[in-house]
Amino acid sequence: LVGSEMCIRDRKNMQEWLADQLVSVEVVERLESKIDGTNKFVFRLQDGNVIESVFMPYKHGNSVCISSQAGCRMGCRFCASTLMGLARNLTASEMLDQIYAITRIMGQRVSNVVVMGTGEPLDNYDNLCRFIRMLTDENGLHISQRNITVSSCGLVPQIYDLADEGFAITFALSL
């Protein structure tokens, strides 16, 4: 430490150490496509629930698709997430931890985030909004809101609430 401020090297070491200590997801399976470099991650949460995330490399930057719930209660016929029912909502930190874990494993920066993995994001509204604020914070990953997409099966009251938040995100409606 130099005076009351940490030197840059100490700050970087501290951030890496904290990231290793605080991640609440454990990789239980990783599948890599030999065709395009896509990686599917199966994570176990601290309570034993399992979720999935996907890393997708593109020329314009890397995208990650994350889960917002362990399971889902929406019952969409086109989606496998509903088969196990809803176990629980993920916290904002658990959503963020999927990105931190993938970034650390892949050794590459994530520039785009899609909330379209396991679960219905708008059914976990408060944690979704908290996650977006944390993700875009300049002291965190500082990902632009314009690089975030939220996909929903269409919970109308929450769609209006999300619009009122003033986020500059992309909203996708799954039909």
Model-derived regions: residue spans:
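Short, small-residue-biased leader/transition segments that mark boundaries at the very start
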Residues: 1-7
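Conserved Radical SAM active-site core
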Residues: 53-169
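Extended basic (Lys/Arg/His-rich) segments that typically form rRNA-contacting surfaces
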Residues: 9-13
